[in-house]
Each structure stands twice: as structure tokens, then as C-alpha cells.
């Protein structure tokens, strides 16, 4: 049943999606999938989540690998979140984790053939239990943050919001810790520019950065990402305004295909 649900959800967020309906229930608070030895008995394995996301942990990282990754020597243990589809959902999910430091965030060009990214996040911890818990927490929030990801065979849209950004979002996107933070993502990239313009005109927000295919911010993916902060209500309103415009534009590229949330919209 879980495999069936995953297939349905991924149909909505990856390039090769079609007419599959989105599941009716929210996965926002669901426990991480696959945390049992039936799927993988290795001690490094923590679990999986949508977007072909896998959670891993290394209790005592080899010294040479530790050094090459440039991780603070005090962190003997690391937690890893890696995926094929999505960067925003996993990064916002990782922002919920505590008692660890985010040592690395990289967004490879991926989306399994689509227009966007995959993601690699590494947590550092002095105790392996903290590293494992950080990965478990992040996995449990991935489904929620796919709630405002929309896609068809022509491209995708992504909208993320938090009322209070923490250190993962600061490291990844330059968010102000403790303040409301939002992002809009549009692919093809021209749609992303319209989303940024719409968000800025919808409410009074403070832009932080814009990532385009060639300015080093998107690993040359065919999308534009807009990052901003401000009053919580304004940030939320800016995202809602951009979302309405973006869905109309992306739908125009493939009018016959559904354009629905991957899980349940949360903004």
C-alpha cells in the first residue's frame, strides 16, 4: 500500500507524471517510512521519504573521509539526508531538526530527468543518537513540505514557508534566524521570474536573493528561485499570490494534464 501511495505522489512531482490523483490524506506528521529491517538491515539505514529520499547515519565517520568533507573534528557522527527529487522540501524539513549542526547542503542537478534538483544534507553530531534523531525528524517532515509542490511534464512549481527560520535555512538560503521566511520556485525559469515579481508586488517583503540558471544558485537547473523574509503574514500572502499566478502559467504549457499538490497544501 505504501509503495502504491509513493508511486501516486511521485507522479505529481516528477517529470513523468500523468493523470494520477493525489492521495486524500496528509503525510505531514507521518513517521518516516521504511524504518525496519525488512527493507534494509544495515546500521547506517534510518528510513525513506517521498522524492526518493533516504536517511542515513554513520556513528563514527572515518578520519580521512571526515577530513576530506571538511567537517568539524568534534562531530564524530553524521546524519545524512539525500534525495533525487526536491531540495526545498528536504531543506525545510531538515530545519526542524535539533541538537545537530548542518555541516553541508548541496543541490545537485537532478529531479530524475526534470527541471530541478536533488539534495544532499549532512548533519554533524557528537553523539550518534542525536544524528539519527535529526534524520528521523527531517524524514517525518518531508511529506508536509511536498504539499505545495506542483508539477506536470512541462515543469514544476514549489512554494515553502516557515514562520520562524532556523539554522538550516540560514545556511542554505540566507534566511534570518527567528524570522518568517519563504521561497518561490518556478520551472521553466521564466515562470520563476514572474513568481518573484508577483510575490514582491503582492505584499511588503524583504528580498534576500534570487537564484537563476547561470548565477551559481541552481546548479544550472531550468528554474528560478526567490528567497525572502518579512512579517509572517506578508510572507505568507506573497507566496499565496505567486502560487495562484504560477499554477495558471504552468497549466498553460500542458492544459490536458492535472496540476495538483504532491500531498496536501500547507500554506
Q: Language-model segments: what does each one mean?
A:
Residues 2-86, 108-118, 126-127, 146, ...:
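A structural signal for small-residue-enriched, beta-sheet-centric alpha/beta enzyme cores
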Residues 121:
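Long, structured ligand/cofactor-binding scaffold of large enzymes
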